[in-house]
Amino acid sequence: MLELNYLSISKSNNTQYGVFKQGDDYVFTCAFDVKDSLILVISDVKDEIEIKIPIDEFKYYGKIYSLVVSGLNLKKFKYYYICDDVICMDPYAKKKCLKRTFGKPYSYTDEDSIIANNEAFFSTDDYDFENDKRPLINHSDVIAYELHVRGFTKHTSSKVKGKGCFLGIIEKIPYFLELNINQIELMPSYDFYEFDKTDVISEEGCEKLNYWGYKSGNYFCPKYEYSYSKDAVSEFKDMVKALHKAGIEIIMQMYFSSDTKHTLIIDCLRYWYTEYRVDGFHVIGPKIPSELIMNDDVLIEAKLLINNINKDDYDILSLYKSSKVIDVNDGFMVAMRRFLKGDSGSLNSFVYYNRLNSPDYRTINYITKYEGFTLNDLVSYERKHNEDNGENNNDGNDENFSWNCGIEGKSAKNSIVKLRTRQIKNALCLLFLAQGTPMLFMGDEFMNTQKGNNNPYCQDNDITWLNWKLNKTSEEILSFTKMLTSFRKNSKILHQNKELMNMDYIQCGNPDISYHQEMAWKSDLSNYHIHIGIMLEGQYSESGDEDTLYITYNMHWENHVFALPRLKDSLEWELVFTTATNEESEEIKADLLNSQDEICVFKRSVVVLRAKHRPLRRINK
């Protein structure tokens, strides 16, 4: 036992990393590859006391060092390690001391600056989650929304107190509810340093800002620069509690580099799931231990989004089927983008992904995400415009499956504005009227633009900050999105727990899903066709009595006449909504009054019909 002033330090056989209180004592456990020396430095919050403890002799097994510190009469303290003269932060630190200004690098030569950025903070404060309960929303009922915490509300137009912070998300909860959003997915919100260290120690010498945060970090801490208050831990928990109270789940994106230890990955996910009560994770990185995560006893009920799951691996596949794992891939995105712009040969893929909803192969649908064009830019640019990134426009994806509607970039030409507005509505229909689970990227609901930048990883400015000031057109898109998400929410037939089979297996007279074009019950998916009608039979809904829907998609640049599947004598087709103009909408209504045999679906438009009971007609005697 080593006695240091009034402290007693003894060896521990603990293998739980980090710091925890054990009675009146504190247990410190860490793992370092030590060549010469390892020192634990503890100080009080006012920096009036500093204690340096050589801990080389407290090696437990392998690289693990563990010690018990008795007599440390501090409820709160700061600490860090010095390994072979290098100042290091505890990889398992739960709180940080320093809150920097986002985007402002620190000096790598000034010792005080280095210490301040590597000091962990420990306190025994408890947080009251009150009666918090996870919403536990069925995957088929989720309407998800991906956002960057800072970019979501940093712009002055957000009109929130906590701009760019977790508090700002709390303040926007009423907005989520208006959009019928019940799950948000946060881009990296753990503590990461926005710059990478280089040999040249100056602001100019640092690499460009990593605004997104897909990099290693202090995985057990929330990002303090995203906190409005000094207490990022409590503010994050306040956010979780408020979201849950509103019936909204929270998914955290966690990026792990290839050299991240698998034990740390599991410990990290467990900690956020149990301590912060998040609902799940989107785990990202080059070497993710998918099988280990899926098989973890603590995480078995957490929602886990994993990129490009290997469905050829039998062991992975069996775990995938039995857990709450969701496969994230770009298949839906590419298929819908190609169909939207009217590519030859795109109909087959559209039909496949529109119906894809296997309970054994859960996926998430999106047309845009953080990486790539926004929805507005998807219909405004055919080429990326990443010059502001400083890489001569060489970064970012060159293949975006986009169409600028005739003019590259911003346009005030009325015909272009109308066509782009129509295409955005069409894209939203492709997303929210498909089976499966939709995810909207922040700002797409009101035509946010990144000015053609499809890789704004280093932009902390108006390119990535949502501008909440709406014009007449963006208000129209926002209103349409709210209507569409409400329609989806209230039409269970659009988000069932099963994949539709194109069969009449309950013998009600119609299959659960059927396809139509110029002739009812017949469809030709040839390469030159870019139009299809899809009927969803209401008797196959969970309740068994929902309205039957007939959704026609015409992404061709010409009008097409669609046959209407014949209904029972007591029913008739009525228009729910269309992405066509008001004048064209009136023509469709007139067509339906004149005949229930066919309708004209105008070029580049979607029409949604439902079967309703015919009104009773009074007979005059």
What feature does the model see in each segment?
Residues 1-27, 48-52, 59-146, 153-158:
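The feature marks proteins involved in alpha-glucan
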Residues 26-27, 34, 513-565:
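Carbohydrate-binding surface patches
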Residues 30-32, 75-76, 589-621:
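C-terminal beta-strand-rich structural cap/linker in extracellular carbohydrate-active enzymes
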Residues 106, 113-116, 277, 290-449, ...:
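Conserved alpha/beta catalytic core and glycan-binding cleft of carbohydrate-active enzymes
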Residues 158-165, 196-245, 258-275, 385-409, ...:
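Aromatic- and acidic-residue-enriched carbohydrate-binding clefts of CAZyme catalytic domains
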Residues 176-208, 372, 376, 380-384:
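Carboxylate/His-rich catalytic cores and anion/metal-binding grooves
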Residues 235, 242-314:
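Active-site neighborhood of glycoside hydrolase catalytic domains
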Residues 484, 557-591:
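C-terminal accessory region downstream of the catalytic core in glycan-modifying enzymes
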